[in-house]
């Protein structure tokens, strides 16, 4: 009674078609891929072609604006030319520049006058430096070995000694009154210049020492002039509190008493100020221990203490 519904069998041609269709589709797919790859390979360029061909997709480079360069145009004809005055003066040392300036002043007196009014006043240190340079040149010109005070040595250094003494005679009046109004400046110069005279050589032949003695004499006169002028300025405070009495006494001792006139002038100037009071060794000195100068009495407030005080009409 049971009835079985039988599934109709699959026709044989269906299996053949299905299997063939799967294999066919795979083979056709592989064939199309192979054909595509072959076409792409045919279209790809070779290595030589890629290296020789310029890139087509490279970005374009935009030129950047450059700053203008200011270059001197070269001269069409190169020729020699002298230096300009500023460049020429840069190559001159002190001695060469001094020589050129001296030559111009000698040929053009008006330039010499302008230089005299334009150049700054030489300081004491600058003047003493020049004199010390002459002194160094003199010392270095002595012959090696032998007697440095002999006539042979004197003849060897005579010109350098003359140059030093001439420079000393030229510089000294510049620092004396009335050309120099400051006593301190004059005294400082004389102090240094006297030291230079002390260092001058002493010769065996007495005649050769006359130049040094003459320099001491001129220096003593210069000391006297400056001391007199300093005593008039400010009551001689510069002389009293500058220690110049001791300095000048030492110079006189080193010079062998050739500055005694200057020492006497200083003692006389300090006498009315109050220096050397009670010392009978200087002219005009007082022997009274209680004698005081008018200046000291004024400064201590004792001036006129022993005088009667008058009241009322004179």
From Swiss-Prot:
Membrane-crossing ranges are: none
Per UniProt, subcellular location reads as: Cytoplasm; Nucleus
Fetch the InterPro entries from UniProt: Cut8/Sts1_fam, Cut8/Sts1_sf
What does the record give under GO molecular function?
A: proteasome binding
A Pfam family matched by this chain, by name?
Answer: Cut8
Q: What segment(s) does the record annotate as region Disordered? A: 25-85
Give me any GO biological process, just one: protein transport
PANTHER family membership: FI02826P
Function text? Involved in ubiquitin-mediated protein degradation. Regulatory factor in the ubiquitin/proteasome pathway that controls the turnover of proteasome substrates. Targets proteasomes to the nucleus and facilitates the degradation of nuclear proteins.
Protein name per the record: Tethering factor for nuclear proteasome STS1
State the species of origin.
Arthroderma gypseum (strain ATCC MYA-4604 / CBS 118893) (Microsporum gypseum)
Q: What is the lineage of its organism?
A: Eukaryota, Fungi, Dikarya, Ascomycota, Pezizomycotina
**Gene of origin?**
STS1
């Amino acid at each position: 009674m049971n009835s079985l519904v039988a599934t109709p069998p699959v026709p044989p041609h269906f299996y053949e078609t299905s299997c063939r269709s799967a294999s066919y589709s795979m083979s056709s797919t592989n064939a199309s891929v192979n054909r595509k790859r072959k076409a792409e390979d045919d279209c790809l360029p070779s290595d030589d072609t890629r290296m020789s061909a310029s890139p087509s997709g490279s970005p374009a480079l935009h030129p950047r604006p450059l700053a203008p360069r200011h270059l001197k145009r070269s001269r069409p004809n190169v020729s020699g030319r002298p230096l300009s005055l500023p460049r020429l003066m840069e190559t001159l040392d002190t001695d060469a520049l001094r020589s050129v300036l001296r030559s111009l002043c000698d040929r053009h007196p008006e330039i010499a006058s302008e230089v005299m009014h334009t150049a700054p006043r030489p300081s004491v240190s600058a003047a003493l430096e020049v004199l010390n340079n002459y002194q160094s040149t003199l010392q270095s010109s002595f012959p090696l070995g032998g007697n440095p005070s002999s006539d042979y040595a004197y003849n060897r250094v005579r010109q350098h000694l003359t140059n030093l003494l001439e420079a000393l005679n030229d510089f000294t009046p510049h620092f004396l009154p009335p050309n120099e109004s400051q006593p301190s400046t004059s005294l400082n110069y004389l102090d240094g210049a006297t030291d230079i005279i002390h260092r001058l050589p002493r010769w065996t032949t007495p005649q050769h020492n006359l130049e040094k003695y003459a320099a001491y004499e001129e220096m003593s006169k210069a000391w006297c002039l400056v001391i007199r002028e300093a005593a008039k300025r400010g009551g001689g405070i510069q002389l009293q509190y500058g220690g110049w009495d001791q300095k000048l006494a030492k110079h006189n001792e080193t010079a062998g008493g050739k500055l005694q006139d200057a020492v006497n002038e200083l003692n006389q100037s300090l006498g009315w100020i109050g220096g050397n009071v009670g010392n009978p060794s200087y002219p005009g000195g007082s022997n009274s221990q209680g004698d005081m100068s008018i200046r000291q009495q004024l400064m201590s407030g004792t001036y006129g203490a022993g005088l009667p005080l008058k009241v009322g009409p004179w």
